Amino acid sequence: MSISNSIRAQIPPIHPEGYPFIGAFALVSLILFWIFAPLGWIGTLLTVWCALFFRDPIRVTPQREGLVVAPADGRISMITRALPPAELGLGDRPLLRVSIFMSVFNVHVNRSPVAGRIEKIAYRPGAFINAELDKASEDNERNSLAISTPHGKIGVVQIAGLVARRIVSFVREGQTVGAGERFGLIRFGSRLDVYFPDGTEVLVSEGQTAIAGETVLADFDVAVPGLTFRSQ
């Protein structure tokens, strides 16, 4: 492998959702260079940051029924019991919830935590308060998915934040998804909540760093040995 190929192999691809933003930053940078060179360099740095924000690295997802993987990169900010969004139809009792906070420096492509069928997708407009606050799950703009699995339904909620103002979904109701498959993206910082069926025990703790499609949040079949992996 040539040096150039080796370098390219280390650079993660950019998600197409980012192309318009990167192009806009690059155009502004060129204009700033023409006006005042130091401003142009600042614009260039912002363009590079924008490209990094929309990076979409390949992830190696463990493939075994019963595993629940992280749907987002970020820090596990909260593990608690909470009522799931009413629009998902997951019941009116509190469920175990794991919240992952994504800063503006994390990868923001979201991945399905499980293999299953998307039973419900529900978008709800709302506010844009700090996504780290507990009340953000109730007050902020959100896009919720209910995914049916042999172990019960999993709720996945994309929550907009203080900076994030656009939730993007790549999937539709009735679609079958694989664990680790890309299902959406949130622009510029946000949060993902995962709601688990009763009886689930999570394998992570608050403050832990999660990697989308790779970090195992829970295992419904802890007694089943053997894992295979799939890059995607």
Swiss-Prot record:
Reactions performed catalytically: a 1,2-diacyl-sn-glycero-3-phospho-L-serine + H(+) = a 1,2-diacyl-sn-glycero-3-phosphoethanolamine + CO2
Record-linked Pfam families: PS_Dcarbxylase (PF02666)
Keywords tagged on the record: Cell membrane, Decarboxylase, Lipid biosynthesis, Lipid metabolism, Lyase, Membrane, Phospholipid biosynthesis, Phospholipid metabolism, Pyruvate, Zymogen
Modified residues (Pyruvic acid (Ser)): S190
Annotated EC: 4.1.1.65
PTM comment, free text: Is synthesized initially as an inactive proenzyme. Formation of the active enzyme involves a self-maturation process in which the active site pyruvoyl group is generated from an internal serine residue via an autocatalytic post-translational modification. Two non-identical subunits are generated from the proenzyme in this reaction, and the pyruvate is formed at the N-terminus of the alpha chain, which is derived from the carboxyl end of the proenzyme.
Cofactor notes: Binds 1 pyruvoyl group covalently per subunit.
Cofactor: pyruvate
Superkingdom of source: Bacteria
Membrane topology label: Peripheral membrane protein
A single GO cellular-component term on record: plasma membrane
Single Gene Ontology MF annotation: phosphatidylserine decarboxylase activity
The keyword Lipid metabolism belongs to this UniProt entry's keyword annotation: yes
Gene Ontology biological process terms from the UniProt entry: phosphatidylethanolamine biosynthetic process
Task of the protein: Catalyzes the formation of phosphatidylethanolamine (PtdEtn) from phosphatidylserine (PtdSer).
Database matches in NCBIfam families: PRK05305.1-1 (NF003677), PRK05305.1-2 (NF003678), PRK05305.1-3 (NF003679), PRK05305.2-5 (NF003685)
The protein's name: Phosphatidylserine decarboxylase proenzyme
Upper classification of the organism: Bacteria, Pseudomonadati, Pseudomonadota, Alphaproteobacteria, Hyphomicrobiales
